[in-house]
Structures are given as C-alpha cells and as structure tokens.
C-alpha cells in the first residue's frame, strides 16, 4: 500500500484552490503517499484536482465514515480508505466496493475485528495520545503479518521510534 517510503502526508484541505501547490511541494519533497481527509467542503474538489495532475501520488482518503463515502471513492478509483475507528458495517461495505479499508484501532478488540474482516493494514490512531510506541508494542504482540500505520501526534521530534517499529 505504501509506496517508496513510510511517510504519509495527512491533509485536511480547507481551500481546494491551493491543493495543487501543496501537492507539488510534497511531491518535490519526495512524499508521494497522501491521506486526504473528507472533513471539509473542499475535500472532494482537492482530491479531484490532485488526481487530474500529472503527479504520481499514492492517494488514500481519510475520515471515511459511511457507504456514501465509499461510493465516492469508487467513482474516483481510489484504492484505499482510512477511518478513525473500527466499524463492522463499513468494513463489510468496503469489500463490496473493492476498496482496501484501513480502520482506526486502539485496542486488541479493534485489531481482532479488523483481522476477522480481512484487513491487512491498521491505522493506530491517535498514536501519541494512546501511549505511542509503548502502547503499540503492548497491543501488537500477536500481530505478525499485519502492517500498522501510525497517525496522530507524530512529528519530526518523535517519528524515529515509529519508523523503526517492526509492524510499521
């Protein structure tokens, strides 16, 4: 799912007119993995503008909460979606639309639900508020073939332990 590197730029775009400039800056910096959040009225316009660009991004969409969001992603040929939580209904619906769903997890129960529904990637969210790498270690002991995508509160000062984690 991740291309080139383990860094994903998480974007909440308020002004779609600025989205291409932002995208070009990220691309020129070597960041090609994007999670564009469906949180603003301009989110969809930004997604469409970036998709139409000649930039070879690996685009995922975040804050996917319902079937309507999945239908939109399918229409845009988006291959993966992020959610802040683990929701059985949307996990099942994502299979119907052939979209790789990456649910938010914070407990071993979340992991169990996600694995039971065929998820290969899990979003550890809100990473730093949950206890960071220490907490991740405690809930991921049974994870062998799954990959974790840590999000929330990670910055240039605390990123190294995440990049070095065996499941990330």
PLM regions with names:
Residues 1-79, 86, 96, 145, ...:
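Conserved N-terminal beta1-alpha1 strand-loop-helix module at the mouth
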Residues 42, 65-68, 74-161:
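Conserved anion-binding
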């Amino acid at each position: 799912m991740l291309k080139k590197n383990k860094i994903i730029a998480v974007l909440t775009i308020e002004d779609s007119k600025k989205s291409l400039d932002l995208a070009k800056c990220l691309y020129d910096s070597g960041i090609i993995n994007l999670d564009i959040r469906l949180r603003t009225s301009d989110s969809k316009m930004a997604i469409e503008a970036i998709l139409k660009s000649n930039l070879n991004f690996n685009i995922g969409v975040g804050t996917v909460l319902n079937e309507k969001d999945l239908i939109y992603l399918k229409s845009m040929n988006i291959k993966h979606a992020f959610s802040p939580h683990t929701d059985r209904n949307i996990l099942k619906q994502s299979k119907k639309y052939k979209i790789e769903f990456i649910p938010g997890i914070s407990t071993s129960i979340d992991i169990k639900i996600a694995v039971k529904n065929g998820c290969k990637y899990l979003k550890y969210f809100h990473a730093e508020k949950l206890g960071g790498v220490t907490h991740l270690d405690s809930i991921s002991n049974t994870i062998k073939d799954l990959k974790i995508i840590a999000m929330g509160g990670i910055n240039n000062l605390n990123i190294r332990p995440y990049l070095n984690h065996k499941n990330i």
